[in-house]
Amino acid sequence: MSIEVAVAAALFVGIIAYAVLGGADFGSGFFDLTAGSSRRGAELRTLVDHSIGPVWEANHVWLIYVLVIWWTAFPESFAAAMSTLVLPLLLALLGIVLRGASFAFRKFSETLGQARLFGVIFAASSIITPFFLGTVAGGIASGRVPLEGTGDRWSSWVNPTSLFGGVIAVGTCAFLAGTFLVADAARSGQARLADELRIRALGVGVVTGAVVFAALVPIDHDAPTLAAGLEGRAAPLVVLAALAGLATLVLLWRRRYSIARLAAVVAVASVVSGWGVGQYPWLLVDEVTIVDAAGAQATLQALLVAVAVAVVVVVPPLAYLFRLTQSEEWTRPDH
């Protein structure tokens, strides 16, 4: 493996981590939005706050990681994507800011009306953010981002591959969140809520799975390079995604919630990995390969050292934080 590919692999590990951890975070907004009235949805919204409260900002570590690696290791392609896809990126950024602010402000609202307003903003921004990030991925994967950065500001992300990418991003986030929330509700003894979420998570999973595989048809015409990769070297990952998704549905149906979470993570990670492997060796599809887009060798070597240090310094505290959130320890009065 060349150093350029090694750095690209490290970059894509961050994308997978953000898709899984940030995705479960974003997806909670879908269930918040569809929870119902203030009284009817109170129990579910409390569960959402309890589940994502300790980690909702920690998940953005992976987005920062991806951006830093990308602009440092592959600066020209980064500049090209930021220029051509500036509109969906700005909308995604707006969603992230609104989501974070409204999540915090809702807790300190003085009136029910304010709480409802911030709740709607939180839920809506939880949907638009992954949608626009998905359109960015679709624009890159369909070869609509020229290296010169002169791509069309609208058609680069308003196209079949991008729109399906956005819908798939929202669906996978909701599916992950539903699976995680079901397990949290069951662990905390909320059996009725767990059963309600179980049915909704099953529905979201079926719809999302159907959309993922339906997208293969327009992608075949709209993004032929990606389609060839998905039908070739990435085919095992496509099959794994299907099997893991099906296993998640079966496990949810049988109320095996802890194992279902692992299967859901495998399913989503396989979908995202399939995209990366499918467009390899291109960084910007049909424009520039990973090797040709890479920066100076010294920079790449320093980045790999930085990644190794980050694994040692950042991953253990994050793992401990996530372990705490999967128990009731952090809610005890002495914590």
Predicted feature locations:
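Juxtamembrane helix-loop boundaries in multi-pass membrane proteins
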Residues: 43-64, 89, 115-129, 191-204, ...
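Alpha-helical transmembrane segments
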Residues: 7-19, 82-95, 123-127, 157-174, ...
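Membrane-interface capping segments at transmembrane-helix boundaries
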Residues: 251-258, 317-332
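Helix-coil boundary and interhelical linker segments in multi-pass alpha-helical membrane proteins
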Residues: 1-11, 71-86, 141-162
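N-terminal signal-anchor module of multipass membrane proteins
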Residues: 1-58, 64-67
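Short, membrane-exposed interhelical loops at transmembrane-helix boundaries
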Residues: 284-303
